[in-house]
């Protein structure tokens, strides 16, 4: 019984609702002023914040390297340490280190640049040259 009454009320109200929608519904001014934008718009904000210091970059890279199980001795992590010769990492480990550095500093290192990073000092030098690194 309730279902029948609800369906009858909906049929009776349908023309009135349709005409109100066609006529337009008044919207508040703040709703009308909002521009239509794409569903997702990536925006990167820059500020004049402090630039990374060399010792800070080195300590963060050393922390990343010390998290790798394959580093033969964490005491060997120095500013001039070579990933393969001094730390005992192979080429795949070096790729993983570069990826971890990308994640640590929120940057993307192109493959041609990543191929040149084989030591801590090269990694520090590269990070310092990137204005997006944080």
Curated annotation (Swiss-Prot):
Annotated pathway, please? Lipid metabolism; fatty acid biosynthesis
Per the record, its GO cellular-component terms are: mitochondrial [2Fe-2S] assembly complex; mitochondrion
Q: GO molecular function, one example?
A: acyl carrier activity
Say yes or no: keyword Mitochondrion present.
yes
Q: Mind telling me which InterPro entries this protein's record contains?
A: ACP, ACP-like_sf, PP-bd_ACP, Ppantetheine_attach_site
Point out residues bearing the modification O-(pantetheine 4'-phosphoryl)serine.
91
State whether it acts alone or in a complex, and with which partners, per the record: Complex I is composed of about 30 different subunits.
Q: Which PANTHER family match?
A: ACYL CARRIER PROTEIN (PTHR20863), ACYL CARRIER PROTEIN, MITOCHONDRIAL (PTHR20863:SF28)
What is the name of this protein? Acyl carrier protein, mitochondrial
* Species of origin: Neurospora crassa (strain ATCC 24698 / 74-OR23-1A / CBS 708.71 / DSM 1257 / FGSC 987)
């Amino acid at each position: 019984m309730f279902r029948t009454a609800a369906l009858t009320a909906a049929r009776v109200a349908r023309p009135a609702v349709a005409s109100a929608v066609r006529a337009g519904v008044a919207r508040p001014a703040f709703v009308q002023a909002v521009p239509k934008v794409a569903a997702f718009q990536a925006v990167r904000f820059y500020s004049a914040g402090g630039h990374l210091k060399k010792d800070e970059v080195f300590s963060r890279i050393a922390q990343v390297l010390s998290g790798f199980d394959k580093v033969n001795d964490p005491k060997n992590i120095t500013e001039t340490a070579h990933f393969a010769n001094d730390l005992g990492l192979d080429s795949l480990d070096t790729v993983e280190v570069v990826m971890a550095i990308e994640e640590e500093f929120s940057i993307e290192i192109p493959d041609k640049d990543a191929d040149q990073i084989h030591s801590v000092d090269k990694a520090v030098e590269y990070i310092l040259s990137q204005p997006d690194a944080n």
